[in-house]
Design a protein with these regions (language model features):
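Active-site oxyanion-binding pockets that recognize sulfate/phosphate
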Residues: 5, 98, 133
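Structural preference for beta-strand elements that scaffold enzyme active sites
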Residues: 3-5, 36-38, 123-125
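An alpha-helical appendage that flanks or caps ligand/catalytic pockets
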Residues: 13-121
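C-terminal helical cap(s) of enzyme catalytic domains, especially alpha/beta-barrels
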Residues: 17-25, 133-149
Length: 149
């Protein structure tokens, strides 16, 4: 009878299963009459898709470090980082970020709407791993605007 939050930025492939189990097993309580699902996930938003892809290279580096056991602090973005990766690394990063959204305002709006439709989430909890603090704040502002549209 409590809300449930799932961190899809850690285990995106388990998202739908986890939500289904939560909803199936939910029992109303004094705190909550019906299920309330929160989906946590990565969003990198910028003024354009291209700028978002560039900023996302910091996230891609972080994920690659997690997957290879080379964890570091968040690193600055790298031009054409994705193109420098082999197909296996690209696939692994894409799988890790499967529930994520990267793009300009329209792409983010469409991506979040798709995620909302697929999960029937009541709320999103966003992580935006952007290296520059001002651009991270802007990413969150663009994301908030996309959610209002």
């Amino acid at each position: 009878g409590l809300p449930y939050a799932f961190a899809s930025h850690f285990a995106p492939r388990m998202l739908h299963q986890a939500l289904a189990i939560y909803r199936q097993m939910f029992k109303p309580s004094a705190a909550l009459a019906k299920p309330y699902a929160i989906v946590g996930g990565p969003v990198i938003a910028a003024e354009t898709d291209e700028q978002a892809d560039y900023l996302a290279s910091s996230t891609h580096q972080r994920v690659l470090g997690i997957l290879t056991g080379n964890r570091t602090r968040l690193l600055p973005p790298v031009e054409n980082f994705w193109q420098q990766l082999d197909a296996r690394s690209q696939a692994a990063i894409a799988d890790f970020l499967a529930a994520g959204v990267i793009g300009g305002p329209d792409t983010v709006q469409l991506g979040l709407q798709k995620l909302a439709d697929e999960t029937q989430a009541d709320e999103f909890m966003i992580v935006s791993d952007v290296y520059d603090a001002d651009l991270r704040l802007r990413s969150l502002e663009i994301t908030a605007d996309a959610m209002k549209a």
